[in-house]
């Protein structure tokens, strides 16, 4: 009986540790293939869901993290409004709007990537004007 108590305590500690590790986000390089694809997906979804006429393009990637044991990415993105309209060709080369129509947003996205199925899902997104 006396050996069961330490074993039970050990299992509880180990289980808690594993559960905690599973919830952590760790930094990844910003050029990691699946992270880059997730960023592109997040920007495209932002543009598709944004009611504005003009598209936004990526200006800067801040935080780049991946949840341990998953393909869930956490990212901070700064985007700027361009002169291009939605569904224009080659929006990557569109210049930013200047003057009174200039607008930038800071967004935090969580993207679940399943690249082997070509499937990405936005889990959470929060955007604020900067």
Curated annotation (Swiss-Prot):
Located only in seminiferous tubules (at protein level). Expressed in testis and Sertoli cells. Keywords: Disulfide bond, Protease inhibitor, Secreted, Signal, Thiol protease inhibitor. GO terms for cellular component: extracellular region. One of its GO terms (molecular function) is cysteine-type endopeptidase inhibitor activity. Its main location: secreted. Disulfide bonds join 84-94, 107-127. It comes from the Eukaryota. It is found in: Secreted. Residues 1-23 form the signal peptide. Residues 37-116 form the Cystatin domain. It holds the Pfam family Cystatin. Transmembrane segments: none annotated. May play a specialized role in spermatogenesis. Belongs to the cystatin family. This is Cystatin domain-containing protein 1. The lineage of its organism: Eukaryota, Metazoa, Chordata, Craniata, Vertebrata.
């Amino acid at each position: 009986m006396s050996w069961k108590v330490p074993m039970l305590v050990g299992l509880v500690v180990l289980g808690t540790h594993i559960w905690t590790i599973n919830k952590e986000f760790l930094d990844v390089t910003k050029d990691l293939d699946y992270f880059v694809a997730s960023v592109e997906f997040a920007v495209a979804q932002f543009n598709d869901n944004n009611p504005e006429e003009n598209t936004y393009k990526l200006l800067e990637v801040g935080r780049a993290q991946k949840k341990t044991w998953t393909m869930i990415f956490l990212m901070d993105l700064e985007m700027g409004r361009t002169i291009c309209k939605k569904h224009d060709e080659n929006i990557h080369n569109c210049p930013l709007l200047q003057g009174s129509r200039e607008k930038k947003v800071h967004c935090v996205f969580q993207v679940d990537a399943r690249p082997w199925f070509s499937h990405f899902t936005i889990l959470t997104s929060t955007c604020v004007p900067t």
